[in-house]
């Protein structure tokens, strides 16, 4: 909006009206700016609420630009002055009130996000693709932060570190989840394509074998692992979930082994895990090839579950996995599930 080109002018025409209107409704419709932001995010699928966007733009800059164009400045925008609508204080998030004070942003019980967990803390481990956080109660959180949370060797490095942290006794359980729209869109195919094109086959072998060993270290470790999924969990992302002891899935989780669509096959244990699950189900198709035919049908057509419930029907979720309806509760529910698994935990048989 600072630029005088067509894009800048259009953005200003839209946001100047939208954001100033939202600000002008305080305190008419609510005295709490958090309610406005939540309403726009939950009701209209905005990534950020009006006051969160104003903080990114700078409230004082926005107010000055309104004045320079002869537009009215909402009272709360004048009141905040050179400050921000949201500030971090004492490891908590506070919001600006109509009285000019800052008070803590309260959340309903059971709401938990990575931003809540990480506020005022430093990660236990980080690289460009993954961060490890202390969730409290001796539970470790692995957060994917790559583009679309795609899985690359750096994520496998981070998951190996998470396994080491838990095996050493520093943590008693692991949750894998994030605040993003998607759990993981799968393996980083751009990287895989590049190393194939340059003929670095040793690197391909390392990527495949490293992924297998890492996921097996999670599946057969001495600690419980819970996958907190939402949105897309495709290919390698699906295989990460299949390696977990439990999956705490948001109802709108779309799971599938889609590798065939790009000319490869699942390489990190997905085929083996699906065969194990379908073969163990007494309701599966009978005969020596019954389960195999069903698996080939799903893998060969790169079928993706359209919901968590369908994922259960397709055996991506087991009967012991759980479904959470509210996205904001997924991480908390996953943590609670992990805590419940700790006492008397024993890893699956090594042959699984």
Task: Give the positions of each predicted feature.
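N-terminal glycine-rich phosphate-binding loop for ADP-containing cofactors
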Residues: 1-181, 190-223, 230-233, 237, ...
């Amino acid at each position: 909006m600072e630029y005088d080109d067509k894009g800048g002018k259009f953005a200003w025409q839209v946001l100047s009206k939208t954001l100033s209107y939202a600000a002008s409704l305080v305190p008419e419709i609510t005295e709490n700016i958090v309610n406005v932001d939540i309403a726009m995010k939950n009701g209209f699928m905005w990534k950020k609420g009006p006051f969160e966007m104003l903080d990114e733009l700078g409230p004082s800059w926005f107010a000055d630009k309104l004045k320079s164009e002869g537009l009215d400045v909402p009272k709360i925008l004048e009141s905040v002055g050179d400050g921000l609508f949201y500030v971090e204080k004492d490891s908590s998030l506070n919001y600006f009130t109509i009285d000019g004070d800052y008070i803590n942003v309260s959340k309903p019980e059971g709401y938990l996000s990575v931003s809540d967990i990480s506020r005022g803390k430093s990660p236990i481990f980080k690289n460009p693709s993954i961060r490890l956080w202390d969730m409290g109660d001796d539970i470790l959180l692995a957060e994917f932060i790559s583009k679309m949370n795609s899985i690359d060797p750096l994520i496998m490095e981070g998951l190996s570190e998470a396994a080491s942290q838990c095996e050493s006794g520093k943590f008693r359980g692991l949750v894998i989840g994030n605040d993003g729209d998607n759990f993981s869109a799968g393996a980083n195919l751009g990287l895989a394509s590049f190393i194939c094109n340059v003929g670095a086959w040793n690197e391909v072998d390392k990527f495949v074998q490293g992924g297998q060993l890492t996921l097996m270290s999670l599946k057969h470790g001495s600690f419980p692992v819970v996958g907190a999924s939402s949105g897309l969990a495709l290919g390698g992302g699906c295989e990460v979930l299949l390696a977990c002891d439990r999956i705490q899935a948001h109802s709108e989780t779309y799971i599938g082994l889609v590798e065939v669509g790009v000319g490869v096959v699942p390489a990190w244990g997905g085929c083996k895990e699906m065969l194990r699950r379908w073969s163990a189900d007494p309701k599966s198709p009978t005969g020596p090839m019954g389960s195999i035919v069903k698996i080939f049908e799903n893998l060969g057509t790169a079928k993706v579950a359209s919901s968590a419930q369908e994922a259960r029907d397709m055996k991506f979720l087991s009967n012991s996995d759980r479904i959470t309806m509210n996205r904001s509760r997924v991480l908390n529910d996953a943590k609670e599930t992990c805590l419940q698994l700790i006492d008397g935990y024993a890893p699956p048989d090594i042959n699984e």
